[in-house]
Swiss-Prot record:
The active site is at C129 (acyl-thioester intermediate). It comes from Burkholderia lata (strain ATCC 17760 / DSM 23089 / LMG 22485 / NCIMB 9086 / R18194 / 383). SMART domains: Semialdhyde_dh. It catalyses: acetaldehyde + NAD(+) + CoA = acetyl-CoA + NADH + H(+). It is an enzyme of class 1 (oxidoreductase). This is Acetaldehyde dehydrogenase 1. InterPro entries: Acetaldehyde_dehydrogenase, Acetylaldehyde_DH_C, NAD(P)-bd_dom_sf, Semialdehyde_DH_NAD-bd. Its EC number is 1.2.1.10. GO terms for molecular function: acetaldehyde dehydrogenase (acetylating) activity; NAD binding. Pfam families: AcetDehyd-dimer, Semialdhyde_dh. One of its GO terms (biological process) is catabolic process. Belongs to the acetaldehyde dehydrogenase family. The keyword DNA damage does not apply.
Length: 319
């Protein structure tokens, strides 16, 4: 026998709808309790209602008014960085844990392959799609040697970027940069996002450049391979696009690193692609898949801990 805690999702857009389907199909310790939006004509709300999930188009106030709210343990916020602060304040007052899929970053950054088991804050931030894909590679290099500078470029299909993503571009780059440093271990980070308008849409592709102290290239390759396997455990479509590349930067020909200055050492280049599971959008939307898969893993962990501690607000027994 195992228990399942009820969760709600605020934001029935691309990310919220994909996450709802993942929770319903693959949630180990969680189940859907409610889907919340602000547009009564939202496709995501209509889909949730057809799937038997309680809905409200009255935002956070609508969630509080639902009968099921008293049973909700965890809320996933897939709205915007601007809206998230109020949502979090309201939910914390009711003892509900929050998983933040916006770049608001009120709580600690969480990337399952790096620190899922070590974090259990009232609010946990899932960084960004680009961060979920690339920061594990920076962390893998940091396990072997000191990383002075890491730069990531996330290229996603324009079709997979909804209004929330587009409204949060500045927050995306800043949040990802900070997480490159805090979770990736780089002294300095930089993040770039590209919305690719190509037709047919291309799957998510990511590039990671890291400048580190000299190190055994074989050990770095092994560390990267292990980290790729860790991410694939919850995002099967995550993979290396090609062999890891190395360039030795000599002291007589140093690189001028932004914010760091002249540096020599080892430059490591990692090329990734992320194919989505096509739960809601087509497989090219790997950027959504890696975010929602990471959030699902985080939600399952949160629920398991809440029930083990006896603080779950409401859950049911399930086979």
């Amino acid at each position: 026998m195992k228990s399942k805690a009820k969760v709600a999702i605020i934001g029935p857009g691309n990310i919220g709808t994909d996450l709802m389907i993942k929770v319903m199909r693959h949630g180990t310790h969680i189940e859907m309790g409610a889907m919340i939006g602000v547009d009564p004509k939202s496709d995501g709300l209509a889909r949730a209602q057809r799937m038997g999930v309680a809905i409200s188009s009255d935002g956070i106030d609508g969630l509080l008014a639902l009968d099921v709210f008293k049973e909700i343990d965890i809320v996933f916020d897939a709205t915007s960085a601007g809206a998230h602060k109020r949502h979090n304040d309201v939910l914390q007052a009711h003892g509900v844990q929050v998983i933040d899929l916006t770049p608001a970053a009120i709580g600690p950054y969480v990337i399952p392959a790096i620190n899922l088991e070590s974090e259990n804050a009232p609010n946990m931030n899932m960084v960004t799609c680009g961060g979920q894909a690339t920061i594990p590679m920076v962390a893998a290099i940091s396990r072997v040697t000191k990383v002075h500078y890491a730069e990531i470029v996330a290229s996603i299909s324009s079709k997979s970027a909804g209004p929330g993503t587009r409204a949060n571009i500045d927050e995306f780059t800043e949040t990802t940069r900070k997480a490159i440093e805090q979770l990736g271990g780089a002294s300095r980070g930089k993040a770039i996002i590209i919305l690719n308008p190509a037709e047919p849409p291309l799957i998510m592709r990511d590039t990671v450049f890291a400048l580190s102290d000299p190190a055994d290239q074989g050990k770095i390759e092994d560390s990267i391979a292990q980290m790729v396997a860790s991410v694939q455990a919850y995002v099967p479509g995550y993979r290396l696009k090609q062999k890891v590349q190395f360039d030795v930067i000599t002291a007589d020909k140093p690189l001028n690193v932004p914010g760091v200055g002249l540096k020599h050492g080892l430059k490591t280049s990692v090329f990734l692609e992320v194919e989505g599971a096509a739960h809601y959008l087509p497989s090219y939307a790997g950027n959504l898949d890696i975010m929602t898969s990471a959030a699902l893993a985080c939600g399952d962990m949160m629920a398991r801990r809440r029930m083990a501690a006896g603080i779950a607000r409401g859950h049911k027994e399930a086979v």
